[in-house]
């Protein structure tokens, strides 16, 4: 990424490239986490752009992350989907790892759905459970909003009193009840990785209020909320 350019210029440059390739932009985006890229099979794809072709985009180095920005219809909804995300442990700065979320906002996305595979710590959870993220604990050593703040993007000191939309959580619970889907809810702990947690760390994270732990999601949510986007998060345990 060309760091000598102004951050706003980088965002605008990338958004302009995507707009030229795609045309009409959706209002909803999904970030597909580890092992969740199979959802793409249910998208009627109109345009798919490899990350390697998008100016200023990082390229995912993680196995299981294909690295494509997809535009198409999921059911009746026109969406943008990131098939593969960028992690702090890969060596990117927080600004680089969350750059796609900045671009989404520039393109007009208002609602962001984030997903991940997480380690469950709540004894009531079973492997394969779906957990709505209702809050998070940020244990990353770097913050995505550290450094110069651009008022055009959001405030210097954004509120995080509702990182995950209460409205969307309520809607998800209603749908799960209608379809008899087992749905859990809890707090996601975000850590740097790439090592998995020690038994002592698991006990610590549980004691401070965590229900699941993973190496992503939190930075993207912080950046999305900084820009006023509505966010819904889901972990696969």
Label every PLM stretch briefly.
Residues 17, 21, 167, 171-182:
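Generic non-transmembrane alpha-helical segments
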Residues 104-108, 206, 225:
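Non-catalytic positions within long, well-ordered alpha-helices that form the structural scaffold/packing
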Residues 110-111, 211, 230:
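Short acidic/polar active-site loop segments enriched in Thr and Asp
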Residues 215-237:
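Zn-dependent metallopeptidase/amidohydrolase metal-coordination segment
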Residues 174-211:
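Active-site/ligand-binding-proximal alpha/beta "capping" segment
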Residues 2-160:
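Metabolite-binding pocket within alpha/beta catalytic cores that recognizes anionic/polar moieties
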